[in-house]
């Protein structure tokens, strides 16, 4: 990555964090609306045959923990990071109480069952910024880019952010994974990602 591209992404990450921070007073309301939109959408599975990978929110991300309380028939997993391998797995999370914090990241406890990425039907992807073409600006570690490359061809990828974090264009590189949908408090929309 060029120095100019690196500086642009750094600037955009600061902008995105400021926009997310501005949404803090409405965070719970936005999260409830996002969960309602998601559970009512045709991409949410009606049974456990097509597992979903959600995420456990960081402080500035939309908090979708309510999915574990929704009593949905879907099997829901969450990212579990292996810091040594710089890899991420989808660990089944049966209860929001079965979570530990490692390096300030909430994740399912170690040694629980996992879902193969190729078996996931829907993956909810947090991000700092998204664009209508499915471009995503993450935190820069590449965990989601590497994980999404392992999904099966039928998997739906859905970026999750506040509507203020959807911008005209996110700078991307060849290795950056795109999402097929974006979920905000205003609803779900398809992107133009292939």
Predicted regions and their residues:
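N-terminal active-site beta-alpha-beta segment that forms phosphate/nucleotide-binding
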Residues: 2-119
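Conserved phosphate- and dinucleotide-binding cores of soluble alpha/beta proteins
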Residues: 86-194
């Amino acid at each position: 990555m060029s120095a100019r591209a690196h500086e642009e992404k750094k600037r955009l990450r600061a902008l995105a964090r400021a926009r997310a921070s501005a949404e803090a007073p409405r965070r719970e309301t936005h999260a409830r609306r996002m969960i309602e939109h998601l559970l009512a959408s045709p991409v949410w599975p009606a049974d456990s045959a097509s597992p979903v990978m959600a995420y456990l929110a960081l402080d500035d991300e939309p908090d979708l923990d309510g999915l574990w309380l929704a009593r949905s028939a879907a099997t829901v997993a969450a990212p579990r990071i292996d810091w040594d391998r710089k890899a991420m797995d989808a660990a089944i999370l049966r209860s929001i109480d079965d979570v530990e914090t490692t390096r300030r990241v909430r994740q399912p406890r170690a040694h629980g069952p996992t879902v193969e990425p190729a078996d996931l039907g829907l993956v909810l992807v947090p991000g700092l910024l998204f664009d209508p073409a499915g471009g995503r600006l993450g935190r820069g570690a590449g965990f989601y880019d590497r994980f999404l490359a392992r999904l099966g061809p039928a998997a739906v990828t859905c970026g999750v952010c506040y509507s203020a974090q959807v911008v005209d264009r996110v700078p991307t590189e060849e290795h950056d994974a795109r999402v097929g949908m974006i979920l905000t408090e205003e609803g779900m929309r398809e992107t133009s990602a292939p």
